[in-house]
Amino acid sequence: MEAAGYDLIVAGAGPAGSACAITAARAGARVLLLEKDHFPRHKVCGEFVSPESLELLRGLLGEKQLSYHTPVSAARIFVDGKTLAFPVSPAAQSIPRFELDARLFQAVQQAGALVREGVTIQQVRHEGAFQVETTHETFTAKAVVNATGRWSKLTQFEVVNKQNWLGLKAHFSEASPPQSVDLYFFTGGYCGVTPVDANTVNACAMVRADVARSLEEVFASEPRLLRRSRDWQPMFPAVTTSPLYFHEPQTEADGMVLVGDAAGFIDPFAGDGISLALQSGTLAAQMLTPFLRGKYSLEQARLEYQTAYRKRFVRAFRNAARLRTALAAPRWMRSVALTVAAMPGIGQMLVRGTRARSL
């Protein structure tokens, strides 16, 4: 059965897809947002929103503001028995995806877009108008935005790293956790720990599959993390995702505009994944709006988005990749790098280098 046409169909209702749908709907577009899951749900994520995107997030949420969040005012890096600490100023926020995604999804509906949960997209065809085929219906639209994540079946890219990496995440009880994002590095991976509230932390790891396949194995891989986690009690079963692959950011595939992890997956230790999702989704909607209003072609809109995306985001991806290489270097080289990073102002400069330029 073929359904009515739309100006824009957004595939995927994570932060990137919801930001895109909200922005386009507020600009007057007829928007359909399709999501394969149901809300609320947990996602593998460090749940860290950098300060550069907090104002954008508040604007997107409108009346659907978050009920709680926890400030993160410091960062600590634990590697090779050493600790590197520096302030995060202005403070970032720790926001559970369980609430964040659900509130953004509500804000999409508040903005006037139509939403469908539990819908799996089978394929997207571009023959003049776009035809989005789902299990039960086919929808048509002038443009399609792919926000279905880094390993979308709608697009496939050549990957940079061939190793099998996986992500794991769960919340654990911890009394009075520090208001810092703590990164524990070990051979074959790392684990980030951030406060969720006064009695809970989020532990999110990226690890090679030959090193660990559970969070308990991750914790055992770093002595200080093992000591810290001994009294932790899980708040829900761990969620996992794999494979984790990196590729050069790409803004378009098969005529669709790509946002969030579908466009590019930044190293999680950079702490900018949610911010990149919010900003790229918003930017895509802004660049598509003139096309949807008949002012210029879809090809020109995609080119405008590509140019703006590269200007604002590609530097962050490349700097994060350089840090990934440095962290995988021999121990003596890491020691030299840590000594340099500990110098006044260097740590903050490295963090700024992995941040997207704000809209």
Where are these regions (language model features)?
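Conserved Rossmann-like nucleotide-cofactor binding loop
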Residues: A16, F39, W151
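Conserved N-terminal glycine-rich FAD pyrophosphate-binding loop of Rossmann-like flavoproteins
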Residues: H38-R58
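Predominantly flavin-linked oxidoreductase catalytic cores and closely associated redox partners
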Residues: A107-W232
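C-terminal helical "tail/cap" subdomain of flavin- and related membrane-associated enzymes
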Residues: Q286-L359
